[in-house]
Amino acid sequence: MISAISSPWLTQLSHFCDVAAFTANSLSSLNASGGYHLSPSPGDPYSQHEPHYEPCSASQHSYSFGHACPEPESGASSSSCASSTPGSGSTGSSSGNKAPVKKNPKVANITVQLEMKALWDEFNQLGTEMIVTKAGRRMFPTFQVKIFGMDPMADYMLLMDFVPVDDKRYRYAFHSSSWLVAGKADPATPGRVHYHPDSPAKGAQWMKQIVSFDKLKLTNNLLDDNGHIILNSMHRYQPRFHVVYVDPRKDSEKYAEENFKTFVFEETRFTAVTAYQNHRITQLKIASNPFAKGFRDCDPEDWPRNHRPGSLPLMNAFARSRNPVSSPPQNGSDKDGDGRREYERDASVTPLHGDAAHQQLMSRVLSPSLPVPGGLVPLSTGRPSPPHELRLDPHSQGSEPLHHHPYKYPTSYDHYLGAKTRPAPYPLPSIRGHGYHHHPMNPAAANMYSGAGAPGGYEYGPR
């Protein structure tokens, strides 16, 4: 039986289909005649050193989903590993010769299209690597699919699992930039299944949008209690995608073999690593991952907003409230905005304007040109300046004009770290009855806190 499940939906699933039958027959359907076999992909760098994968017995591994074993490529007769039903502990060829089960019409016509296939192919040509950590690490590329052929009114559950490609452990040879077999595989990790958090849902909901498993995390912690997928480092794995029809019949366990359909994409196989081995994989991940901007070659002014942990909430406020006319459109702005919103959700930061005290503080820290939430009055009533404009000393400005807008988002240095010598933006007992002073050596601070519009009779100290 499954030792750990990454979603509370197991209880519901057990009412609709027998998990044991699902896990056992999932493997059988893959290795049956006409099914999927884990043979080397075209251009797979591993195939240079491993011309074929030897068939192995499922009993060698303790995976509740069995062990997906490939078919020999040396011209031998077709054979596949028999999947042992939990509790039986025996293997044989009967299940391999078993006639394929006729699928329920609710799942028979379902087809799945892998999103970002070109990117997956590019990684696969190099030999995809996925980082595993103790705390858990998300996959990149993210496993995303588009589903067709579902019954719009039927309920479905979507889940993923990972099976070893073979029973070998690998090492990376840096002198030849290739993977080599280092020996037999380590003891198998506990088999786990990741349920999509929206499961179960109607077919219409699944089909109207791309299904993304962006919450799935990989770990090498055998004692993990967060429901992450546990993998062995330096081993190869094949992700599998399963669609399970939620059968409302009371005796649905009798139809467990009919009510699911499994999809395997060869280009998504990968090697689990604790650190990237192939430098070309590292470069490709940096170039294609929208959240790896901090590792790219960029202007030095860009790095604080990507690496300073306290700058994200402030930058989000500027990004949401900035004047769209103040900066010209740039290529990829929509994609960057989507990635930033994704990162905001993932970072789980606290709301910026949760209480009045925070709003008061933000109204004094932010530029006077930015709208202040909660109906607060900006400190300056003078002519507002664009939120992205950084006023420089006239003596330091060169004659060469700036032909491009430097940054899409303001840097934390411009708006937070630039005015290092300004007075405190919050009230202090010693500050009474006078506005903020212009700083003769820091025009940016003078522009941020202008005393021209400060009310003369207002006391900034405690009342």
From Swiss-Prot:
One of its GO terms (biological process) is ectodermal placode formation. The lineage of its organism: Eukaryota, Metazoa, Chordata, Craniata, Vertebrata. Binds DNA as a dimer. Interacts with dscr6/ripply3. The gene is tbx1-b. A motif (Nuclear localization signal) lies at residues 420-431. This is T-box transcription factor TBX1-B. Its main location: nucleus. The keyword DNA-binding applies. Probable transcriptional regulator involved in developmental processes. Binds to the palindromic T site 5'-TTCACACCTAGGTGTGAA-3' DNA sequence. Induces pre-placodal ectoderm (PPE) gene expression in regions where RIPPLY3 is absent. Plays a role in the formation of the anteroposterior (AP) axis during embryonic development; required to establish the posterolateral border of the pre-placodal ectoderm (PPE) acting downstream of the retinoic acid receptor (RAR) signaling. Residues 333-343 have a biased composition (Basic and acidic residues). InterPro entries: p53-like_TF_DNA-bd_sf (IPR008967), T-box_DNA-bd (IPR046360), T-box_sf (IPR036960), TF_T-box (IPR001699), TF_T-box_CS (IPR018186). Residues 323-332 have a biased composition (Polar residues). It comes from Xenopus laevis. Keywords: Activator, Developmental protein, DNA-binding, Nucleus, Transcription, Transcription regulation. It is found in: Nucleus. GO terms for cellular component: chromatin; nucleus. Residues 75-96, 367-380 have a biased composition (Low complexity). One of its GO terms (molecular function) is DNA-binding transcription factor activity, RNA polymerase II-specific. Residues 119-297 bind DNA.
